[in-house]
Amino acid sequence: MTADGRGRIDAAFRGRLGRFVLDASLSVPATGVTAIFGPSGCGKTTIARCIAGLQRLSDGFCAIDGEIWQDGMAFRPAHRRPVGYVFQEPSLFPHLSVRGNLLYGAPKAAATSIGFDEVVELLGLTALLGRSPHRLSGGERQRVAIGRALLSQPRLLLMDEPLAALDRTTKNEILPFLERLHERLSLPVLYISHDMAEIERFADYLVLMERGRVVGAGPLHILQSDPALPLAYSRDAAVSIDGLVEAYDERYGLLTLAVNGGLLHVPSHRIAVGARQRLRIAASDVSIVRARPSESSILNILPARIVTQSPPGAGEVTIVLGLDSDGSGAPILSRISSRSRDLLGLSDGMAVFAQVKGVSLVRASGCAIGNMGPTAPGQLDHCSTQDTGVRSEAGTTAMPIDFAEIDPNRVAAILYRPQDDLDTLLADFAQDLVRAGERIGGIVQRNIKDGSGCQVGMQAIDLMTGREISICQPLGSGAMACKLDAAGLADASVAVASAIAQDVDLIVINKFSKQEAAGRGLRDELAGAIAAGIPVLTAVPEKCFEAWISFTGGIGTTLLCERQVIEAWWRDTSSRMKRMREDHDAVVAQCIEISGALPLVQRVVARQLVVTHDLPLDPERAEAEVVVRGVVERTNVEVLDGAADEADEAPDAGFPVGPERIERLPDIGPVPRRHEALQVEREVLSPDACLQRSAGERVDVFKEGKTKVGTVLVDRGDAELVEGPIVLELHEGAPVLVEMNVGVDLQTLYEIAVRGRVAGAERRCAIGLEAFAQRRPQRDVAFRIGGPKRDVFEPVKRFGTQPGIGKDRPVLCPAVRLDRRPLGDRSVLGPREPDAGAKGRKRQNDPEVAHIAPCQHRRTSPHLASARDALFGPREWISATYPPGNMTNAADRLLDV
């Protein structure tokens, strides 16, 4: 190959593979990211395998930067080609740790273009190095696969749809890392995808393929606006162009960016002057006028010239515009009606003005848009949104949420369209902050209804004090009809307006629903809050995620963890079960990582997932809060022996709790030094007898079989076992509160562990929810107890089913005996194991082990385990697993911990 081929990737392959015929040739720069785009089955993967040497065609040519790898005379095998290949499904060695997988393909030579530490830092793998692949989420495994490919010191990186098998949440986790690779490494990348949204974020060059042939190749923005190619006429037609930051207007929150052909003003946070930004201008956001308007709300009005027009179709026409008066600037697209074109008399070569109504910052340096705040150790500070979607016409201003600067007493938490009073997503969020020891003024809105059930107004409750406050004003008697969505919208609108008027530091709203996505609901109120400089924290259903991004520009923090989305996954028990489990694990793992990255919000805003931190206990007043069905109960907990002398040590960094939290709890009596065994004795042993119990009936609870300490409340519906809790209610001062639940497709037994910590022991205790779908209609319930030298996993014995009461509906109705036993430096509550004399059961009779009836072993979800271990350390945790029958109640019980 001559010097003419230097700086290029040249490839040409012809051949037949079964019925598929490949006849493709390309010549692209050997720098930056070149995307190969096309529909499934067009030959993208085949041409990548040919370049890598994994597929050999007799008629082929391949040269990289002037070095020939294949021609008619020679063929360099795959193992001798310096290519890093990242497949759709990451293939990691299961017997090696993350560190071992990364170093496996690294060359032995000392000279390297990219080092181990640099790869670990770029991809955020520090916290994962000691883990096994089965304990990684899908996104984490793919990041490890990318790191292993980079450490092989390749001259070319091939990425074959690396995000195709991932859900949107996990894609958004990985894309910022790919952007960092693009910005910091000079390595050429061939990126294969059929998703234009991925390509628009970081690709420089584009190759279009169709039916085994290359139909176009060139710079991304040129091909997007080429009237001879289908991209310009697609429904989501847009052009991606790069601009340089020239200035920032602090007053209006506007960036001024210079593009080829003029200046664009885009709402954004502050970005350094000279930084390069990727902009996306959709054809539907560009209108055309013959003369510059003197008065208009549209900020971006640029001189342009019509390059060409598409033939009219379906009443619309796509027009290619060249910015600048002579049309020599960057090309953009405009989609208008055929009638508008005729009324304006538009023709090729005509000078016009382009009104750009909306501009999206596809990739913003600084990563403030959508950033989750300060990062946890081992995590990268990166953007988490796919498209900031900042809209000029909306007047929104993108900004990060800096939790360090937020006054905890100036946070408005608004419960929008509540379904179960305080038993809702936002209530859980605010109460989590209270239980975690955070000093935050959570405000929850509640609807006020008259005797007929019609809504007549609102009230707001401060979750910290329980007092009613006046942030929301009543709307007047009879103002709303009952069961109308408009009522909830109007109430929430008043609440948002009141929060804006009081100039709060943060607005927390529990959902962004389909009404906002359709252009109704709280769009105006939220836009007003954003315009006033108040960040918004919300939970967004995945189906509304794009609408949220387009509307708000990713303002603040978006968590894809809404309860309804998860529950919808669990309701489907068809062949999609395996995929649902993977999706749920990925979402939950993502949420755990997010929660670990926030110093203020220690737990994820989601009902189906809870991650708790241990509380340092004061030896003079050790108390724990337990919330059951929205009611806060406070009970004493035991101070473990040996902790009294060391409990004054500071708590772990990043978890600001201490004596001030203890001091504001009411005095409920002395702290017991030791727990005594508790027994729950019930004479009801069979499902038939269980069904005969009446709702509200109570069964006595005795201590050591003699002293009555409480009752079991039987709250049962009808003979079909409608869900209802059975609660062990203890008198004031009793050490433990336990709840069980009986319901359709739900068998639940859980423990509330004393969350203590012996200072210096470097142990943590956390209780988290692990729920995953299985094909069996019955589910096992299990506890897992881990320590530095012991790892016990003994599921609770499966309960039987009652014929004729629905299909395979489990019945939890045997006699239950609970006792409390010490376990190292913590106490664990669980079913008592019958004595066994066999030597083989010595481990079960160990007094330091929580005795649980043995049953079939079941592994813990690797995604959840890996994410949990990143926060709390491996094996230093306690957790409970639940079936998918009713995720809401299962999560509620763990929220109570």
Curated annotation (Swiss-Prot):
This protein's UniProt keywords: ATP-binding, Cell inner membrane, Cell membrane, Membrane, Molybdenum, Nucleotide-binding, Translocase, Transport
Protein name as it appears in the record: Molybdenum import ATP-binding protein ModC 2
Gene Ontology CC annotation, any one: plasma membrane
Function according to Swiss-Prot or TrEMBL: Part of the ABC transporter complex ModABC involved in molybdenum import. Responsible for energy coupling to the transport system.
Domain ABC transporter: from-to ranges: 6-236
Membrane-topology descriptor: Peripheral membrane protein
EC number(s) recorded for this UniProt protein: 7.3.2.5
Residue ranges occupied by any Mop domain in the UniProt entry: 295-365
Provenance organism: Bradyrhizobium diazoefficiens (strain JCM 10833 / BCRC 13528 / IAM 13628 / NBRC 14792 / USDA 110)
